[in-house]
């Protein structure tokens, strides 16, 4: 009876149809291991690509004969397209099936990566990055869904742990790998490396999951909802990516983008909540656990990712680190994250996920507090210690929050829920990065002004330093050197302000997570029931 009105309504609301086929049993033995590796590899490749190009922008821009400012469209174009298609995962899954959609997305991601490497102009590269971002959207939510379906209910926490491990480590590894490839080879190779990796991931995924397809339904296309989604998300992402460059709301372009985004978002909410077949299931937010879980995850990830972006910027611009060296400072975060994430997955079967999240946020707060004591004389060992400790928090916050957001959900709604959750996470990361980089500049200007009140011509310290420098430099260069020292101190103090604020936010988030009421009837706090139903 596919295609009936009742089934279409079920598809739109996320409810399971009355005559749903029996769920697939969990995978066993080698099949589960191979399937998990294949899915994790695809996720790692996808998430890595969101950050690997960041440190290569100067090289790409120079090779294509454009400015670094124009080169940032390589990042913006991917982010906009990706943000639009991620929340469409639930609807696309109902049309094409989980396995088919995941394989199509992975193979198209490989193709567009190859095209990006062959691009000979900025215009061509931006077009291919738009296509790459668009096809990448469903990969992360569906990898989570398929991973959950591979494990028995009592091991759902472990499934989430394996998935989260690759999702969190990849953004940290991206700048390190991107810098190394750009320095050692040429920038197209940051895209070419996806080809063999993606093909292997797709082939093994097909071998393991080809007979585990989810049911499909011929539901109508919500054209108005799709159009409004494209407009408000696209305008928002461009505004966030270009806001600092255009001086935010002093620019008519940013003001226009903000107005368009807000108006389109309001109409999108109204339309999707009244449409019989919405393209995005906003009714998921009627669930307390989903709302609190997604909100907490979004805020925490926004602060976490903003700090991930800020550290390399500070190290490269004001501490004299190369891109590769800055990557080595941030890379150790993956040490404890990789080792402890499986442990957290096992703990989730017996512990209240809110306790694990609270522990993670307190560790994040400790790390931020430690960083707030940095200075320009800090050696690499001093910088690395908080990074290593942060890996403990990474292992303990992402998996339990995902379990909370899925707790109590009908299995048929998991793809849509995962898509919305990941959309909120990615958008929060963009918000956090834009807000943090803007605050960094603003607070640096404040500190520079305060420092200049002390270090100015006529003050003993300034005059002494100036006379010393004049022995080897002309007056203009001596003044420029002193101003450079003030800038370094000002931006360092500004970074410390942000680290301190991050610590406060993480402490406050410990209260927010306790507003959730995860179902404790299942082996993993209710998340296992939702996850296990995805089989």
Residue positions per predicted region:
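Hydrophobic transmembrane architecture of multi-pass small-molecule transporters
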Residues: 11-21, 25, 70, 200, ...
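Small-residue (Gly/Pro/Ala) motifs that create kinks and tight helix-helix packing interfaces
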Residues: 57, 170-182, 432, 436-440
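Helix-loop-helix hairpins in multi-pass membrane proteins, especially solute transporters
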Residues: 86-225, 252, 411
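Short helix-capping/hinge motifs at transmembrane helix termini and TM-loop junctions
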Residues: 120, 152, 208-211, 244-245, ...
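C-terminal membrane-cytosol helix-exit motif in multi-pass small-molecule transporters
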Residues: 196-214, 231-241, 260-274, 510-517
């Amino acid at each position: 009876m596919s295609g009936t009105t009742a089934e279409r309504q079920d598809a739109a609301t996320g409810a399971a149809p009355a005559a749903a086929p029996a769920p697939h049993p969990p995978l066993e033995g080698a099949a589960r291991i191979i399937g998990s590796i294949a899915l994790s590899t695809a996720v790692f490749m996808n998430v890595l690509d969101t950050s690997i190009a960041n440190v290569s922008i100067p090289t790409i821009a120079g090779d294509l004969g454009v400015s670094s400012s124009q080169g940032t469209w390589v990042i913006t174009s991917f982010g906009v397209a990706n943000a639009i298609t991620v929340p469409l995962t639930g609807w696309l899954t109902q049309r094409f099936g989980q396995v088919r959609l995941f394989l199509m997305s992975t193979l198209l991601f490989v193709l567009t990566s190859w095209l990006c490497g062959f691009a000979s102009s900025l215009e061509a590269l931006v077009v291919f990055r738009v296509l790459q971002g668009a096809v990448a959207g469903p990969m992360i939510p569906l990898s989570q869904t398929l991973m959950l379906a591979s494990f028995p209910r009592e091991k759902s926490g472990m499934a989430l742990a394996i998935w989260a491990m690759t999702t969190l480590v990849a953004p940290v590894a991206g700048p390190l790998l991107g810098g190394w490839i750009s320095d050692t080879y040429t920038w197209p190779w940051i895209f070419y490396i996806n080809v063999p990796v993606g093909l292997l991931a797709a082939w093994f995924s097909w071998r393991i999951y080809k007979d585990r397809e989810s049911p499909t339904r011929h539901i109508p296309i919500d054209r108005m909802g799709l159009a409004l989604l494209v407009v408000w998300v696209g305008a928002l992402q461009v505004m966030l990516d270009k806001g600092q460059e255009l001086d935010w709301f002093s620019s008519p372009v940013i003001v226009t983008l903000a107005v368009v985004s807000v108006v389109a978002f309001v109409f999108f909410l109204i339309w999707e909540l009244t449409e019989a077949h919405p393209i995005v299931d906003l009714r998921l937010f009627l669930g307390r656990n989903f709302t609190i879980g997604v909100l907490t995850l979004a805020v925490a990830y926004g602060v976490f990712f903003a700090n991930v972006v800020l550290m390399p910027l500070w190290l490269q611009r004001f501490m004299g680190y190369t891109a590769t060296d800055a990557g080595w400072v941030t890379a150790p975060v993956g040490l404890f994250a990789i080792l402890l994430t499986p442990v957290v997955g096992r703990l989730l079967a017996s512990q209240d996920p809110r306790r694990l999240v609270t522990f993670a946020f307190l560790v994040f707060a400790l790390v931020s507090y430690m960083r707030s004591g940095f200075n320009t004389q800090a050696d690499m060992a001093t910088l690395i210690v908080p990074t290593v400790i942060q890996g403990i928090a990474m292992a303990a916050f992402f998996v339990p929050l995902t379990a909370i957001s899925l707790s109590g959900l009908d299995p048929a709604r998991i793809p849509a829920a995962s898509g919305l959750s990941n959309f909120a996470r990615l958008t929060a990361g963009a918000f956090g990065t834009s807000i943090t980089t803007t605050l960094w500049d603003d607070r640096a200007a404040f500190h520079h002004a305060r420092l200049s009140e002390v270090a100015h011509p006529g003050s003993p310290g300034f005059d002494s330093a100036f006379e010393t420098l004049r022995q080897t430099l002309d007056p203009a260069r001596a003044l420029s050197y002193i101003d450079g020292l003030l800038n370094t101190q000002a931006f360092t103090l500004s970074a410390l302000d942000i680290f301190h604020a991050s610590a406060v936010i993480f402490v406050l988030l410990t209260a927010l997570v306790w507003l959730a009421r995860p179902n404790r009837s299942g082996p993993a706090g209710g998340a296992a029931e939702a996850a296990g139903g995805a089989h």
